[in-house]
């Protein structure tokens, strides 16, 4: 048994003049995840950073990116939120519009984690049971 989400959800907040916009989407394949990430980046071309994480295959495949933020301050906290909520087959992208104030490593980690958590809270979560397709002849 694992958890995923029904559909796209979004949440946002402002931290010291930087706007953080988090979007979470269900994805079935790595190609779906990359397509979702690229679409969010295209929507937010003027953003300073579009950091992401995704988990597929019941947690067997995960990827993340800090997209130019200091190492370990963005993608990893987003991935932690996905894993702590027991989610799979989801991708989260957190877009940051820089407000001119540096947040520091701790501030960035908290901000990206908060944004990702808010997106998960905004999503409708469902429980799924892995199944195999059988053909009867």
Question: Residue ranges of each PLM-predicted region?
Answer:
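Conserved structured catalytic cores and adjacent interaction surfaces
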Residues: 107-109
């Amino acid at each position: 048994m694992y958890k995923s989400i029904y559909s796209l959800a979004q949440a946002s907040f402002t931290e010291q003049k930087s706007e953080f916009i988090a979007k979470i989407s269900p994805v079935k394949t790595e190609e779906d995840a990359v397509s979702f990430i690229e679409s969010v980046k295209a929507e937010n071309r003027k953003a300073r950073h579009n950091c992401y994480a995704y988990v597929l295959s019941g947690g067997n495949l995960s990827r993340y990116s800090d997209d130019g933020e200091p190492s370990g301050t963005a993608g990893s906290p987003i991935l932690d939120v996905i894993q702590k909520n027991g989610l799979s087959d989801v991708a989260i992208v957190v877009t940051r519009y820089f407000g001119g104030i540096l947040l520091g490593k701790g501030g960035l980690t908290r901000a990206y984690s908060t944004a990702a958590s808010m997106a998960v809270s905004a999503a409708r979560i469902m429980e799924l049971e892995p199944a195999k397709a059988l053909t009867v002849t």
